[in-house]
């Protein structure tokens, strides 16, 4: 088990910022293998204003985005760019996306991603999001990394 990664460290690993950062903390990871992170879902999320008034539910595509961000963190922890550069991961594909449980304010989404394969700049991962012990969402995700100047 590695030490946890807080939001300030996450900001060094992902380009996302409010209101689109969907990972609050990494609680465990092993480079080139897996990462476990959390997203605390609160009523203050801007998407709850319209999805849905009086019945707030986290959109499924944002659960997938949270998984994709967790994948980006794992990939960036697993590979070092050239001096003065950083990797930006583009969402390149998704397969087998399934939604099993609604996510509402007050839930803590546990994001578990596992590296399924990596070839050159392409990263394939499997992700699962849980509320407690209930599977909320799962998918196979593909990203393409591009090395860009800082």
Swiss-Prot record:
Pfam families: FabA. Its EC number is 4.2.1.59. Gene3D superfamilies: Hotdog Thioesterase. GO terms for molecular function: (3R)-hydroxyacyl-[acyl-carrier-protein] dehydratase activity. GO terms for biological process: fatty acid biosynthetic process; lipid A biosynthetic process. One of its GO terms (cellular component) is membrane. Its main location: cytoplasm. Keywords: Cytoplasm, Lipid A biosynthesis, Lipid biosynthesis, Lipid metabolism, Lyase. It is an enzyme of class 4 (lyase). It comes from the Bacteria. The active site is at residue 51. It catalyses: a (3R)-hydroxyacyl-[ACP] = a (2E)-enoyl-[ACP] + H2O. It is found in: Cytoplasm. Belongs to the thioester dehydratase family. FabZ subfamily. Involved in unsaturated fatty acids biosynthesis. Catalyzes the dehydration of short chain beta-hydroxyacyl-ACPs and long chain saturated and unsaturated beta-hydroxyacyl-ACPs. This is 3-hydroxyacyl-[acyl-carrier-protein] dehydratase FabZ. It comes from Legionella pneumophila (strain Corby).
């Amino acid at each position: 088990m590695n030490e946890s990664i807080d939001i300030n460290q996450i900001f060094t690993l992902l380009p996302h910022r409010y209101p689109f950062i969907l990972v609050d903390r990494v609680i465990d990871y092993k480079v080139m293998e897996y990462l476990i992170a959390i997203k605390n879902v609160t009523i203050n999320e801007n998407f709850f204003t319209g999805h849905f008034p009086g019945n707030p539910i986290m959109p499924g595509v944002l659960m997938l985005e949270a998984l994709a961000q967790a994948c980006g963190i794992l990939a960036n922890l697993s590979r070092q760019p050239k001096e003065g550069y950083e990797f930006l991961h583009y969402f390149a594909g998704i397969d087998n996306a399934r939604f099993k449980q609604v996510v509402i304010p007050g839930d803590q989404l546990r994001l578990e991603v596992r590296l399924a394969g990596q070839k050159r700049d392409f990263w394939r991962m499997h992700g699962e999001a849980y509320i407690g012990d209930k599977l909320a969402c799962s998918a196979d995700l593909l990203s393409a990394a591009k090395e860009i100047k800082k």
